């Protein structure tokens, strides 16, 4: 079985799930799977994927896992008590061949948000591992280890990068569970203090690494349906987050509606309240410069704020960003696919995104054309109008 622990997921799933329990326990949602890599035939592996998901749905949290979560300063005891009773229910997920053909599959997750939020990351990891164990039956781990050594060598070679730290954000698109663990341990041993930790809660617990993460796009997307007014949905999301965490976990995600809309909503109050912001689409250098100017315009010292970069990073790009912004602010870098799925094979660009909440469409309007995802064109057009966002010529968000 690929997934053997419900902790084998990203930390932000638990931080968001706690908000859902306390503030939105009645919300119902729908998620859909999408493979952005052309020419990939996943249909032959549907039965294997279903078997693995069935195994996932048989898991429960152990006492050791619950005790680990309980020790986190921002996790509340009633949430841990809820998790003690929790398991994923197979009735909320369907996996079928897509009517589009071309080897595509449809994965639809639909049900109470509280009971479906933990599907996304392990299901993506399952799809990845099932695909690669069938297409690469003798993985070239030697090549993977050599590439990983070169990355560690590159980052650790120059003294001026001694304070440049990276984190593992690679659970969802990892080559395999075994390889992911080896990568995390190799980074820990090879980088020392330059390895900040991992988003994966299971490996953080098992190997005493720092678990990392705050919020994901789905949280702010759901607020489109849960908030009092669509135009105020991003502000509402940040306010509800602050209500739950009271200044903890203070990294705001900036690209659900694009950078312009984010800066309009991220006023002086939020600039001072939140520790920083995370970049996940668009030009990271331009984004960073705009964030620093925005902090200064709102009477915040940028040197006290954290800029988190997590969009398709590799080590050279991390180093370029570090050189640009060091000593101007605090920095954090989350590297995903380039760490956990770089053995010489083309990684799958797969996502599972929320598309509906309480029966109404929700959407992400990314700063990167092609990363948006919505199955309702009329709603997407309305959302762009409400937030004053022009439609990129090459962005087909419904695909």
Curated annotation (Swiss-Prot):
HAMAP family documented for this protein: NAPRTase (MF_00570)
Post-translational modification as stated in the protein's UniProt record: Transiently phosphorylated on a His residue during the reaction cycle. Phosphorylation strongly increases the affinity for substrates and increases the rate of nicotinate D-ribonucleotide production. Dephosphorylation regenerates the low-affinity form of the enzyme, leading to product release.
Modified residues (Phosphohistidine): 217
Pathway the protein takes part in: Cofactor biosynthesis; NAD(+) biosynthesis; nicotinate D-ribonucleotide from nicotinate: step 1/1
GO biological process assignments: NAD biosynthetic process via the salvage pathway
Purpose: Catalyzes the synthesis of beta-nicotinate D-ribonucleotide from nicotinate and 5-phospho-D-ribose 1-phosphate at the expense of ATP.
Gene Ontology annotations for the cellular component aspect, listed alphabetically: cytosol
Keyword Membrane applies: no
Cross-referenced InterPro entries: N/Namide_PRibTrfase, NAPRTase_N, Nic_PRibTrfase, Nic_PRibTrfase-Fam, Nicotinate_pribotase-like_C
EC assignment: 6.3.4.21
Cystine pairs: none
Protein name stated in the entry: Nicotinate phosphoribosyltransferase
Single Gene Ontology MF annotation: nicotinate phosphoribosyltransferase activity
Family, similarity comment: Belongs to the NAPRTase family.
Group of enzyme by EC: ligase
Superkingdom to which the source organism belongs: Bacteria
Catalytic activity line of the entry: nicotinate + 5-phospho-alpha-D-ribose 1-diphosphate + ATP + H2O = nicotinate beta-D-ribonucleotide + ADP + phosphate + diphosphate
Keywords for the protein's UniProt record, in alphabetical order: Ligase, Phosphoprotein, Pyridine nucleotide biosynthesis
